[in-house]
A protein has these predicted regions:
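Active-site-proximal mixed secondary-structure blocks
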Residues: 1-30, 36-108
């Protein structure tokens, strides 16, 4: 095995799209690159302050989807735009429906 050198980041990583509703029921989503499966039925997501994390703190619920090659543009957009200034779901042209399991959106 060849020495890869000192690297501070290991890539590529899975991109998680975290979906939440705000206190008015408006859906929001963010791109969370710092996430991983930490147990058989558990994920760990490291988040700083974002509109999505504020929503989660208020509602206690979120959904997780995976960014894929088919959703790369929308996934990237969810990571570069702030939900504090615009409705990212609406601006991206996405449709959502409420999860049957938690009070959070499923992005279609």
């Amino acid at each position: 095995m060849e020495f890869a050198g000192n690297k501070s980041v290991i890539t590529p990583e899975a991109v998680f799209i975290i979906g939440t509703y705000d206190e008015n029921g408006v859906p929001n989503a963010m791109n969370a690159a710092w996430a991983m499966q930490s147990d058989m039925n558990e994920i760990t997501v490291m988040l700083s302050k974002h509109k999505t994390t504020e929503n989660f703190e208020k509602t206690g619920a979120f959904t997780v989807a995976f960014g894929t090659a088919d959703t790369v543009l929308i996934s990237d957009y969810f990571g570069v735009e702030t939900g504090k200034k615009v409705n990212k779901i609406e601006k991206a042209g996405c449709h959502v429906h409420k999860s049957a399991h938690v009070n959070a959106p499923i992005i279609e």
